[in-house]
């Protein structure tokens, strides 16, 4: 069963990343690897119900202006791990399912 991947945008970014554990994937509609990442994010959300998993759609006009001002992305998708508002880890490109589960477990589960 897949979990819920939340929509992350400027309006909810701080609240989302301030949670005890959050994974944010940044992507573009034109990015083929970003599309293949969606089911992996859903599986991760299902395995970790206490962790917020979200996706920031960087291509949608006006949704992520502030996020773009504070973050630089070399490639998409990019995945950031947060705990209580603090960035813990960044991964570029698609993170394979087993690695995403391991990183989430190792860095966000107390």
Show where each model-derived region lies:
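N-terminal "domain-start" segment that seeds a small globular fold
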Residues: 1-15
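Thiol-based oxidoreductase modules, predominantly thioredoxin-like and allied folds used
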Residues: 5-9, 26-28, 38, 42-65
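Short amphipathic alpha-helix with an adjacent loop that forms part of the alpha/beta core around
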Residues: 15, 66-71
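Short active-site neighborhood of thiol/selenol oxidoreductases, capturing the structured segment around
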Residues: 17-29
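Short cysteine clusters
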Residues: 31-34
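Residues at alpha-helix caps and immediate loop-helix transition turns in enzyme cores, especially N-
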Residues: 36-37, 96
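Non-catalytic, surface beta->alpha helical segment in thiol-disulfide oxidoreductase systems
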Residues: 74-110
């Amino acid at each position: 069963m897949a979990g819920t991947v939340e929509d992350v945008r400027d309006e909810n970014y701080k609240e989302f990343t301030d949670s005890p554990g959050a994974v944010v994937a940044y992507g573009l509609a034109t990015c083929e690897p970003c599309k293949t990442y969606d089911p992996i994010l859903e599986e991760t959300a299902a395995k970790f119900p206490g962790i917020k998993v979200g996706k920031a759609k960087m291509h949608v006009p006006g949704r992520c202006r502030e996020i773009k001002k504070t973050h630089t992305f070399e490639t998409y998708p990019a995945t950031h791990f947060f705990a209580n508002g603090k960035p813990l880890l960044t991964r570029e490109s698609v993170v394979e399912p087993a690695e995403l589960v391991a990183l989430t477990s190792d860095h966000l589960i107390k």
